[in-house]
Amino acid sequence: MYILTIHTISDPQAFWSGQLNLPEGTELPMVMPSENGTRGVCLFKSTSVETVRNVVDGATSAVSRNEFYAINEGGALGLPA
């Protein structure tokens, strides 16, 4: 399943320079920061929203407010193959 994350970032340097420890079965094919780095959208492929939430919030909750949702793949355009 694909999961979209939306980030409102208070410390862009810390957020964008951090590393995520992705568990097996979780991929991060797209990362899209805003020009000034205070907003961002990421696309994950994983087994559940909860898996992505645990990884992202665990690494960034001190510097970002994060939103998560599973994508309706049947209605989406342009998802990675």
Describe each PLM feature range.
Residues 1-57, 62-64, 68-81:
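Short S/T/G/P-rich N-terminal loop/turn motif that feeds into the first structured element of a domain
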